[in-house]
């Protein structure tokens, strides 16, 4: 059985891990880093960059550099209107009222962009393992709804991965934290504040069982929001000084974003930081600079609303778990934003104890996902993960009311059935409107799917018996069935349409992603070949300069001809022509080297070390064995 990798698909950064000899290993990417920025850039010429290379060019290419795409996953366009206004790239309304990223007229779904990041993580794992990877455990925020979970699963499929399990991020973190403590009975709180989402989960650990008792959170609260309070402060200060709003210029906005993120990070370890952005924007033809000092106290004042927003979900989670803060043995911090001192202080205030800092907040979720992968393959034994559904599920009934079938914080997988009936006489069909949320009225909850049960036998109202069954799998994804008990007619829906993508669209996107991966591979091979040619040109010119006068004329001419041909092919970046020219140049260099070696040997009456005429990759003439008569035996004493 192949390896199942664990991927933390984050808003700001992503991380991949794998189990090696029962130990989870965080895999270093091609840039030598253990986490990869969740950034995708489209550059001129159709090239696509992912991770650090994409992030590095963001300032000069703000409208085609995509970040924080996780905040758009599984949402309708109307639900992300605030996010749309914040980002410099263009987001438009697509089919089924879904948000789409517009790059030169080509519309990309959030799932496609996320798939590009997942492909990078997949390739990172394959390079490390030396084998193809086809299966993964991918983590999501605990408070992700059904549509967001399904969108994540689709992103994995588009990336060419079979998603074996969707795991909640705090639950994965608890696995990583508690695996070596599984013989201990503990109650832990996992406080997960990442780049775009906030989760709090209360768990009980003991005898290898990791049982989630409750979960709560906010899928639109995270490090991005802390960045934006700094961005808005900088922009308003500059506007009051210069009368210009920097937020209207995409390039200036990107510079503000990077400066805000850097300042936020610095303020975790220092009491103040200087933000210095020269030539931020010309005003009346005069270039203006932005130089401001931000103190930690001012930052905490700006972010106070966000800090306080963490309190209520924690209190609700404790209440839902039937616990008080005194029952919690350990508080685990997960996500880069938990490094903010004010967040650590509020956590200590909520739970009455200092949080544990025994895990790496950037890597622990991916490590937990890899452990879950090990559970699925059988590598990790005697571990049972009992997760919960974060939100209540039900259907719309007469009067626009939501009737719950499954309550929030129910352990999954789970199945629940209820009998419903018709509202009017001789009603031929019923519409099942599936909802997710905690509000009493249907309109106030998230609509995650609709389907019809047709062919109901004519009967007076309230006579037919329609059995509606909700079935949630271990991924937290819902399957709904409606069954007319009188006629035996049955209709079911796997809630996939809520993400806005049909099976055909997913298939097309998967094929495109595979084609792009192949194109990326060919592009790398092309660049490598051009670099080889460049190296061969340099080495050949160097050798001609050093030894050219020693060549017989009839051997030097073919080298000059082949070298000129290679230079032309290199300039044109014609890979086929480069291959031919390199082969010709190699042949000419080898022939010249042999001739020169022969001449030197004849002149000196014996074999001497010959010059290297292999170009960038040719053979070298090595040192020859020396005559034994010239060898002197020497005694030596080892000094210790």
Curated annotation (Swiss-Prot):
Listed InterPro entries: ATPase_NBD, Chaperone_DnaK, Heat_shock_70_CS, HSP70_C_sf, HSP70_peptide-bd_sf, Hsp_70_fam
GO MF entries: ATP binding; ATP-dependent protein folding chaperone; unfolded protein binding
Cysteines paired by S-S bonds: none
Induction or repression: By stress conditions e.g. heat shock.
Compositional bias (Basic and acidic residues): 626-640
Alphabetized Pfam families for the sequence: HSP70
Biased composition (Gly residues): 603-617
Gene3D superfamilies (alphabetical): 1.20.1270.10, 3.30.420.40, Actin, Chain A, domain 4, Substrate Binding Domain Of DNAk, Chain A, domain 1
Membership in a protein family: Belongs to the heat shock protein 70 family.
Entry function: Acts as a chaperone.
Name of this chain's protein: Chaperone protein DnaK
Organism: Porphyromonas gingivalis (strain ATCC 33277 / DSM 20709 / CIP 103683 / JCM 12257 / NCTC 11834 / 2561)
Organism phylogeny: Bacteria, Pseudomonadati, Bacteroidota, Bacteroidia, Bacteroidales
């Amino acid at each position: 059985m192949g390896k199942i990798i664990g991927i933390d698909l984050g808003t700001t950064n992503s991380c991949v891990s794998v189990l090696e000899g029962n130990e989870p290993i965080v895999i270093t990417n091609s840039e030598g880093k253990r986490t990869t920025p969740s950034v995708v850039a489209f550059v001129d010429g159709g090239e696509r960059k992912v991770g650090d290379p994409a992030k590095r060019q963001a300032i000069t290419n703000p409208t085609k550099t995509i970040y924080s795409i996780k905040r758009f996953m599984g949402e309708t366009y109307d639900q992300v209107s605030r996010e749309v206004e914040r980002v410099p790239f263009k987001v438009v309304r697509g089919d089924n009222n879904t948000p789409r990223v517009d790059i030169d007229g080509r519309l990309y779904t959030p799932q496609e962009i996320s798939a590009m990041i997942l492909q990078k993580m997949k390739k990172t794992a394959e390079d490390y393992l030396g084998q193809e990877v086809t299966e993964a455990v991918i983590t999501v925020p605990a408070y992700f709804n059904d549509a967001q979970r399904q969108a994540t699963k689709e992103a994995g499929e588009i990336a060419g991965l079979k998603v074996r399990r969707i795991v909640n991020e705090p639950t994965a973190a608890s696995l990583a934290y508690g695996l070596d403590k599984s013989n201990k009975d503990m109650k832990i709180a996992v406080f997960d504040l990442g780049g775009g989402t906030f989760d709090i989960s209360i768990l009980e650990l003991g005898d290898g069982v990791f049982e989630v008792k409750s979960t709560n959170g906010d899928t639109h609260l995270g490090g991005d929001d802390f960045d934006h309070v700094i961005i808005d402060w900088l922009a308003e200060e500059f506007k009051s000084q210069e009368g210009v709003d920097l937020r209207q210029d995409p390039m200036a906005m990107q510079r503000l974003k990077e400066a805000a993120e850097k300042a936020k990070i610095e303020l975790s370890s220092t009491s103040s930081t200087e933000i210095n952005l020269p030539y931020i924007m010309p005003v009346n033809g005069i270039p203006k600079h932005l130089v401001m000092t931000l103190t930690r106290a001012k930052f905490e004042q700006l972010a106070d609303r966000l800090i306080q927003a963490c309190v209520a979900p924690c209190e609700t989670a404790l209440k839902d778990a039937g616990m008080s803060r005194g029952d919690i043995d350990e508080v685990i911090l997960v996500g880069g934003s938990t490094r903010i001192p004010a967040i650590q202080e509020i956590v200590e205030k909520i739970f009455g104890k200092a949080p544990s800092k025994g895990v790496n907040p950037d890597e622990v979720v991916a490590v937990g996902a890899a452990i879950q992968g090990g559970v699925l393959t059988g590598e990790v034994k005697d571990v049972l993960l009992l997760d919960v559904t974060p939100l209540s599920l039900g259907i719309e009934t007469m009067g626009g009311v939501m009737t719950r079938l499954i309550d929030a914080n129910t352990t999954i997988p789970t199945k629940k059935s209820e009998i419903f009936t018709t509202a009017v006489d001789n009603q031929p069909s019923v519409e099942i409107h599936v909802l997710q949320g905690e509000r009493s009225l249907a309109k106030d909850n998230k609509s995650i799917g609709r389907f019809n049960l047709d062919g109901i036998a004519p009967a007076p109202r309230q006579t037919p018996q329609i059995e509606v069954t909700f079935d949630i799998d271990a991924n937290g994804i819902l399957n709904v069935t409606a069954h007319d008990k009188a006629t035996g007619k049955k209709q079911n829906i796997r809630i996939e349409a809520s993400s806005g993508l049909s099976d055909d669209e997913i298939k097309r996107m998967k094929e495109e992603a595979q084609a792009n991966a192949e194109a990326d591979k060919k592009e790398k091979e092309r660049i490598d070949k051009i670099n080889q040619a460049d190296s061969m040109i340099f080495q050949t010119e160097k050798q001609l300069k050093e030894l050219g006068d020693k060549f017989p004329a009839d051997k030097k001419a073919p080298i000059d001809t082949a070298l000129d041909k290679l230079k032309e092919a290199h300039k044109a970046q014609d890979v086929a022509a480069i291959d031919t020219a390199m082969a010709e140049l190699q042949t000419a260099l080898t022939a010249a080297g042999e001739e020169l070696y022969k001449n030197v040997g004849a002149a000196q009456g014996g074999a001497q070390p010959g010059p290297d005429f292999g170009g960038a990759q040719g053979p070298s003439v090595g040192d020859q064995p020396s005559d034994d008569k010239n060898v002197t035996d020497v005694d030596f004493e080892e000094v210790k």
